[in-house]
A protein has these predicted regions:
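Proline-centered loop/turn at the N-terminus of a beta-strand
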Residues: 100-102, 176
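Small/polar loops that bind or transfer phosphate-bearing groups
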Residues: 16-17, 43, 103-104, 161, ...
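N-terminal helical cap/lid subdomain that shapes the substrate entry/recognition surface
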Residues: 2-97, 110-113, 121
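Asp-based, Mg2+/Mn2+-dependent phosphohydrolase catalytic module
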Residues: 1-4, 92-95, 108-208
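A generic secondary-structure micro-motif detector
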Residues: 15, 37, 80, 102, ...
Length: 208
């Protein structure tokens, strides 16, 4: 069998959490006095990095306050969070065929656990979350760590991502990247090696 591993982003790739994410961030932004337009383009980037990007001039204690606030809001709001079509079937097939995979997410561990449970997505013990890396997406460390946890070089790992920051992270880590067109268009993910209209296309693209 072809030696390969799969590294899946979570939000927008395996689960649809769009409504919950938007509700949480709109609430936090209104409370913090952050213009909503300042948050544009940050999908897929860890909350802590996003908040530092949009309010860099505020005191550290206040930055930490809003990081905690939006994380708490996201953990509490799981309404409508569900698996992306084809996700459960794909992961079941990978398990049946003993093809290694894990999750590489910008969520904190607590948020990832909450969302995978809500979406009924299995969360492997070797998943990579934001609080396990020093620099999250768009930096390459999350996918490098994900490949290490699979015991594979990044050169034979496929990363499945829906956001530009995640694509950049995976490409810079040395992975082959499949951009799933759930939250962004093909034109918005120009650096992905492949594009997927549906997760059921992944194994064929990978030659499996």
């Amino acid at each position: 069998m072809k030696k390969i591993g799969f590294l899946f982003d979570l939000d927008g790739t395996l689960i649809d959490s769009t409504a919950a994410v938007m509700n949480s961030w709109i609430t936090m932004a209104n409370e913090a006095g952050i213009p909503l337009k300042a948050l544009a383009g940050h999908h897929g980037i860890p909350a802590a990095q996003t908040i530092r990007n949009v309010i860099p001039d505020r005191e550290e204690a206040e930055i930490q306050k809003w990081i905690r606030r939006v994380t708490d809001l996201e953990i509490a709001d799981l309404d409508g969070v569900h698996a992306v079509p084809g996700a459960l079937e794909l992961l079941a097939e990978l398990n049946d065929r003993e093809i290694p995979w894990t999750i590489v997410t910008s969520c904190t561990t607590d948020l990832a656990i909450a969302r995978t449970r809500a979406g009924k997505i299995p969360m492997p013990a070797n998943s990579v979350t934001f609080d396990q890396v020093t620099r999250g997406k768009p930096f390459p460390e999350p996918f490098i760590l994900g490949a290490e946890r699979l015991g594979l070089p990044t050169s034979i790992c496929w990363a499945i991502e829906d956001a530009p920051g995640g694509v950049t992270s995976a490409k810079d880590a040395g992975c082959t990247v499949a951009g799933v067109l759930t939250t962004h268009s093909r034109e918005e993910l120009p650096h992905a090696d492949h594009h997927l209209e549906h997760l059921n296309q992944l194994l064929g693209k990978a030659g499996l």
